[in-house]
Amino acid sequence: MNQKVILHLDMDAFFASCEQANDKTLKNKPVVVARNNDKSIIIAASYDARKYGIKAGTPIFEAKQLAYGELIIKEGNRDLYEEYSERIFNLIKEQFTYKVEVLGIDECFIDATNIWEKYGNVQNLCLAIQAAVYQETGLTCSIGASFTRLFSKMGSDMKKPNGITIITKENFKTLIWNKSIKDVIGVGSSSLEKMELLNVKTVNDFVKLDEKIIAESFGLSGQKMYQKLHGIKNDEIAYWETSVKSISKEKTFDKKNMAIEDIEEILFNLAEKVVLRMQKNNILAKTVTLSIKFYNQEINFDKKQHKKRRTYSETFGEYTDSIEKLYSRVKVILDDIYDGESISLIGIGVTNLIEKDKLVKQQSFENIII
């Protein structure tokens, strides 16, 4: 049986980084996400803000003093963060593996047991994931790789931002056991109080305790933590084993008033990427969708249409993976709806999918019936 290879992907300063990726004028500036109220607490801080000593939990009034005259406060945009999150997790499922357990808006576990060898080694796989996420979103992520969930999750926090930490059966005692017991995920405040009484300050102090003392002092949870810190068990990833239901690519624009020819060229490039992904997955599509978002915020968008964007779909008479058919159809849609407004995002997607092999079998069966 192959040893598990579990990755934990954690986006770097996610909320603040989304704001910077969405507005290029914020690049390399101290950006924080919080209510613009001196009594408010910062929810997220960009790495540029952290250079001033600002971090999540810092009061706004203090942050303004630390980055006097430089601090940029964004009040938060949940739709934006969810949009980036969805793009990231869909990308991983479509390009790498469907064995993804989403933990929150900015982190997930990935079971890479059966895919890492394609990349030569685990390091190369992690680099490929980081590159794909950055190319898709302009955001960086840190990845921990190990044979258990706990070690991979702790690893993703060791070399931020944009870092990779691989924890093996050979090095986990060096990388994990030397850390403060406070850094271990799952150790609560009540357990920490008991550990102080036992003079436990590091993971090494804890694992050296007699197992009987651990059972008496911390009960079943302490025994489980003891096992986890020895790399025992804790290696299952909860994922939904579903086939691909849609494939899409989109592009946000940094500048307004782009020429229609440039927009059409970008749309064609997006269509090419969608078709390449379809062909990689041996998939045909029957429905194509154009997604479009405008800079003019006064437009009365239908919020149900995927986060303030307009979508237009058309269905073909037969399944296809033809770049010519897909692009020509969305170009006709674009020509019909475009009236010169500045576009902030454009995308193309396909749904109503079928595997080529299944379609061939289906057509063969229909021919027999006929």
Regions found by a protein language model. Give the residues of each.
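Basic, low-complexity intrinsically disordered segments
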Residues: M1-I185, S189-I370
